[in-house]
A protein has these predicted regions:
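Periplasmic alpha-helical coiled-coil/stalk elements that build and connect Gram-negative outer-membrane
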Residues: 2, 139-254, 379, 425
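Short flexible linkers and secondary-structure junctions
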Residues: 25-147, 287, 342-345, 355
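Sec/SRP-type N-terminal targeting helices
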Residues: 45-49, 62-63, 95, 109-137, ...
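A short glycine-centered flexible hinge/capping loop motif at secondary-structure junctions
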Residues: 179-183, 408-412, 449
């Protein structure tokens, strides 16, 4: 009775543990994989930090229009022969303590519009940094799509290889029975055994490819490698139903206004234009307004107690001197550049070169997008045609294999013919699986360039 009780406890614990493991496996669709990647990936955080830096640059350029404000206090002690400026008298062989304080402000009134243009340039740079964030996200979405479909393809190929192993093992078992009664030769057994080994090797390779693509996908999602996940399989039927032939020109025109690469290159060109305006501002005069207020104190300052008696004096107290010695200053300063050792000339020339570089980068981005879109349209049309051909090829190979097996079972075909037919059938099945997911992938690439959400209808 105790043995039965312990066995029941162990079995129940094993069942619950297995059930929890199954429940713990996370089912991930492509939309969920993209969402987790965009929420967690460090590359996006880095791009957002660069955007934050650009925002601080804009804030600083706006703040540069404001006047500065500073205050200073000086405390000095002096001994010996000197002329004291505060008391306006000569001090000899005595300690003198002086205190001075001031508050000042300075504001730039005109600087060739450099500050205003810098604000405009920094606004554009902030927009460019924002599009860089979108570009990083776009690239990650494409990487997720590639690795997701690669993992799905490898998994389905692995499942197909398991079916092929079961089929070849079944054939090996039948051949072994036929060999034992003298109906098959040793060569037939060797061929059959070789087919089992070949299929098992295919499974090992496909399993490794599946695990590698799944690991890459987890890394994009910033997910621990030990996390158990399964991927939702997309439906090919919905893709084929909506997969109308695309016009490359239409796709390109829509992609021009949606792809972050193009938007960023256009903004970078606008920044380069503003940099020319900033550089040209160096040729203009600079006008500044300064304002200051100050006061001071000296321990050597004295006053006569009696106006008629110059020998009777008293030391003027600190508060009285601070009040009496107040001073106010305001002034304008104008600096006119006459010759700056060609610095302004070089700055303008470099800014113009920067504009040419930005224009070249924009054109290059458009050219690359045009090539990619045209290639994507050709690829999706070719993928649909290849899937149709692969379907016909698999059906033909399946029929040929069944016919060869029937002939082999009655002794009308040898083991080499059966081995060849099975190999061709297996290859056709693999080609069909790859063609199927290639159609899905190529169709979603078009959605990617059009800026459409990447999502699948699941089987």
């Amino acid at each position: 009775m105790k043995r039965f009780y312990y066995s029941a406890v162990i079995f129940t614990g094993f069942f619950l543990g297995t059930n929890n493991l199954i429940q713990a496996q996370q089912v991930v669709g492509v939309a969920e994989a993209i969402r987790m990647t965009l929420e967690r990936n460090v590359q996006i955080k880095q791009a957002e930090l660069s955007k934050d830096l650009a925002a601080q640059d804009l804030f600083q350029s706006k703040s540069n229009l404001l006047p500065d404000l500073s205050a200073s206090v000086d405390q000095n002690f002096r001994y010996g022969f000197a002329f004291d400026l505060t008391s306006a008298q000569i001090v000899n062989n005595a300690w003198t303590r002086t205190t001075a304080g001031s508050v000042g402000s300075r504001v730039n009134l005109f600087q060739g519009f450099q500050q205003v243009n810098q604000i405009k340039a920094n606004k554009l740079q902030l927009e460019s940094s924002a599009t860089q964030v979108d570009k990083v996200k776009n690239d990650l979405v494409l990487n997720v799509l590639v690795n997701y479909l690669e993992a799905i393809t490898n998994h389905e190929l692995m499942v197909a290889s398991e079916d092929q192993i079961a089929l070849s093992k079944q054939q090996f078992s039948l051949d072994s029975i036929q060999f034992s009664v003298g109906n098959k030769t040793l060569a037939d057994i060797a061929k059959s055994k070789n087919q089992v080994a070949t299929n098992e090797l295919n499974k090992v390779n496909l399993k490794n490819s599946y695990e590698m693509s799944l690991l890459t996908l987890k890394q994009l999602m910033e997910m621990p490698p030990e996390t158990s996940i399964s991927l939702e399989r997309p439906s090919l039927e919905s893709v084929l139903l909506n997969a109308e032939d695309k016009n490359a020109i239409d796709v390109y025109q829509k992609a021009l206004i949606r792809q972050p690469d193009i938007l960023k290159s256009a903004l970078d060109k606008e920044v380069a234009l503003k940099q020319i305006d900033i550089a040209k501002g160096g040729y203009y005069p600079t006008l500044n307004l300064s304002v200051s207020y100050g006061t001071n104190y000296s321990s050597a300052t004295t006053r006569q107690t009696d106006p008629l008696d110059i020998t009777t004096v008293y030391r003027v107290p600190f508060s009285r001197q601070i009040s009496d010695n107040k001073s106010f200053f305001t002034g304008l300063s104008l600096a006119v550049p006459i010759f700056s050792k060609n610095q302004n000339k070089v700055n303008v020339a470099k800014a113009k070169i920067g504009l040419k570089q930005a224009e070249a980068n924009e054109q290059l981005a458009k050219n690359n997008l045009n090539k990619a879109v045209n290639q994507a349209v050709l690829d999706v049309n070719a993928a649909k045609q290849k899937y149709t051909s692969a379907t016909v090829a698999f059906e033909s190979a399946e029929t040929a294999y069944k016919a060869t097996k029937e002939r082999y079972d009655i002794g009308m075909a040898n083991s080499l013919e059966l081995f060849t037919a099975q190999t061709e059938r297996n290859k056709a099945e693999f080609d069909l699986i790859q063609a199927k997911y290639n159609v899905i992938f190529r169709s979603k690439i078009i959605d990617y360039y059009l800026g459409n959400p990447i999502q699948f209808d699941n089987n």
